[in-house]
Amino acid sequence: MKRTLFIGMLGLSALMSGYAQQGEGVRKGRIVREPLVHDPVMAKEGDTYYLYSTGHNVSSFSSKDLSEWTIRHSVFSAPPQWAVDSIKGYEGHTWAPDIIYYKGNYHLFYSCSAFGKNTSAIGHAYRRTLNPDSDEPWTDTGAVIVSHARDNFNAIDPNIVIDEEGNPWMTFGSFWGGIQLVRLTEDLTSTLKPEKLYTICTRQFEGASDV
């Protein structure tokens, strides 16, 4: 039976910039002992830990022992075209991913935004394995939720939770109206309609996974 472990990497959040912000200039396959990452999330599949973070097209690393990390290719080979077309100022620097194993697939949620604005979107992609050597690509399904300048919320920093009845929810947000909670569809590709947002923190706060 496949065992999967998800761990919130709050301790790594303090290690800003570094490899995650060097983008395509970082040599893939290089082994490092102290990867500097921003907004990390980690999952374990089999005997390997996989770390994803803010970076160009979502940075990724893998490790067998949580000590030595191999720099892997970015999740996407190019910025999602739907995000480039719909979010002015977005050029592929993708923020604050979240990972969840759900109904046979790994689901990746990621943030696309223009810095300092709430013209943003949270995207979704899925894959059956986290193994970067697999021939199976991430299948991107596009935007889960979008925020515009007229909205009092910011569609970034997603975190997925499953309630006691098995229903999927997403917390997200940063500044503006604070942290929001919204129900997702069973396939996790969009918000449940009619869409209803619940504000769970109204201060200028970010980090929905902390709530």
Predicted regions and their residues:
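Bacterial Sec-dependent N-terminal signal peptides
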Residues: 1-23
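Carbohydrate-active catalytic/glycan-binding domains of CAZyme proteins
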Residues: 19-211
